[in-house]
Amino acid sequence: MKPHLKQWRQRMLFGIFVWGLLFLAIFIYFTNSNPAAPMPSSFSFLERRGLLPLQGKQRVIMGALQEPSLPRSLDASKVLLDSHPENPFHPWPGDPQKWDQAPNGFDNGDEFFTSQVGRKSQSAFYPEEDSYFFVADQPELYHHRQGALELPSPGETSWRSGPVQPKQKLLHPRRGSLPEEAYDSDMLSASMSRAFLYRLWKGAVSSKMLNPRLQKAMRYYMSFNKHGVRFRRRGRREATRTGPELLCEMRRRVRVRTLDGREAPFSGLGWRPLVPGVPLSQLHPRGLSSCAVVMSAGAILNSSLGEEIDSHDAVLRFNSAPTRGYEKDVGNKTTVRIINSQILANPSHHFIDSALYKDVILVAWDPAPYSANLNLWYKKPDYNLFTPYIQHRRKYPTQPFYILHPKFIWQLWDIIQENTREKIQPNPPSSGFIGILIMMSMCKEVHVYEYIPSVRQTELCHYHELYYDAACTLGAYHPLLYEKLLVQRLNTGTQADLHHKGKVVLPGFQTLRCPVTSPNNTHS
């Protein structure tokens, strides 16, 4: 009898041990998971204002952060302006004083990143040879556990649309709903601490300062290389160009180009008489005097910039960004509207009949292969913008409506990459950057609002949608961070306007006085 009793006790102890392990595993799983975080789609990295998610449709942005945004009260804004990087809200690793001592905010090569990251990494730098190629293999999928990302396979969803999800799941929890310990140093340093914003204003930030989730998403797109980017460096990198030097280089190279119906396959499809007779670049041959580019960032709310915006000769807006109900902050005038291809392709946006897209100059775009192969693009666009374009042109033949040529879009990408010391995402620039360059080609002076965020910076993606995500400001699919750093170098406006209004002032290309020949003029 005793042996049986002993065996029974052993089995009971073993069962208790197994149940204990199971309970521990379940406890660890639920404590490490983040059920409040939205599941990301395969793109959805819409920039904060350029490729707008449209009204009534929510998206998930990969690399989304679940941190609270900066306080938007006047007192908080004043504190931000009065603060000094040597006494930041949450200091970055390394000595902040080095930023002020080094020219252009940089020390030298590897040391700059080493001091910020705490370890040496060469992955962000160009190789020594004159060209490099992005990897084009299938990347490893990340999982949405313990703060990581789960990225669907490239064929599952488009680069600009994610699954529609209940709105409440897309919103950040408010500060009052989270325990105090949730606001730890990881959250504050994630994307837009006071120190980070200060350095963004100075142009002294890098991707190594982004939170790990955005960095992971950026690495994903680096390895995926959907558009087949094969960048060849033609001359030395010019990340240290001065603002005037960079402006002259851009003036020499940037030529706004749209489909004119002369190239195959469009020439064989009868597009020549369909497109506007006057090219976009010649609509205002004498140039507009003063123009505004109004980003759709949530930070523009409570800005009272509407009257100033409407005072410009021309105003550019993006996608479905409305003015009705927001006139005090964004104004009412719209001259040009840049729209992504989803607006044309998705019937829910009522592109043909909506008043939002009437009585304005329309400029549409869709990502094409880096090779700018028009035949391949026509057969497989991200969204079929060609059919609705034809329908719109036939119904409203007098309205100026253009489709940007892929070569123009990728030319802008080349300029960003050549003037950036890091490898940037091999994806098209944001609509915001495209719009800025178009207006610099058409206007004598361009005022850009809330592209580089002001003290009102918030993770609210767009002023007309209750949707929060840090990736809207710093990007992950688009090379937004690098675009902003480049525009910061071009800014001729005041620091006060940048801080309080989020306003950057850029000269139009036609007003520049550049040397006839330049020693750096090595690009074709």
Curated annotation (Swiss-Prot):
One of the Pfam families matching this protein, by short name: Glyco_transf_29
Topology term for the membrane: Single-pass type II membrane protein
Tissue/organ expression: Mainly expressed in brain and embryo. Very low expression is also detected in spleen, oviduct, lung and skeletal muscle.
Subcellular location, record wording: Golgi apparatus, Golgi stack membrane
Stretch forming the signal peptide: none
Region (Disordered): 152-174
SUPFAM superfamilies tied to this protein: Glycoside hydrolase/deacetylase (SSF88713)
Listed transmembrane segments: 12-32
Molecular function in Gene Ontology: beta-galactoside alpha-2,6-sialyltransferase activity; sialyltransferase activity
GO BP term, pick one: N-acetylneuraminate metabolic process
Record EC number: 2.4.3.1
CC terms in the record's Gene Ontology section: Golgi cisterna membrane
Cytoplasmic side: 1-11
Keyword field: Disulfide bond, Glycoprotein, Glycosyltransferase, Golgi apparatus, Membrane, Signal-anchor, Transferase, Transmembrane, Transmembrane helix
Disulfide bonds: 248-514, 291-443, 461-472
Catalyzed reactions: a beta-D-galactoside + CMP-N-acetyl-beta-neuraminate = an N-acetyl-alpha-neuraminyl-(2->6)-beta-D-galactosyl derivative + CMP + H(+)
Positions in the Lumenal compartment: 33-524
Main location class: Golgi
Record: glycosylation sites: 302, 332, 520
InterPro entries xref list: Glyco_hydro/deAcase_b/a-brl (IPR011330), Glyco_trans_29 (IPR001675), GT29-like_sf (IPR038578)
Role, per record: Transfers sialic acid from the donor of substrate CMP-sialic acid to galactose containing acceptor substrates. Has alpha-2,6-sialyltransferase activity toward oligosaccharides that have the Gal-beta-1,4-GlcNAc sequence at the non-reducing end of their carbohydrate groups, but it has weak or no activities toward glycoproteins and glycolipids.
Similarity annotation: Belongs to the glycosyltransferase 29 family.
Entry protein name: Beta-galactoside alpha-2,6-sialyltransferase 2
Species for this entry: Mus musculus
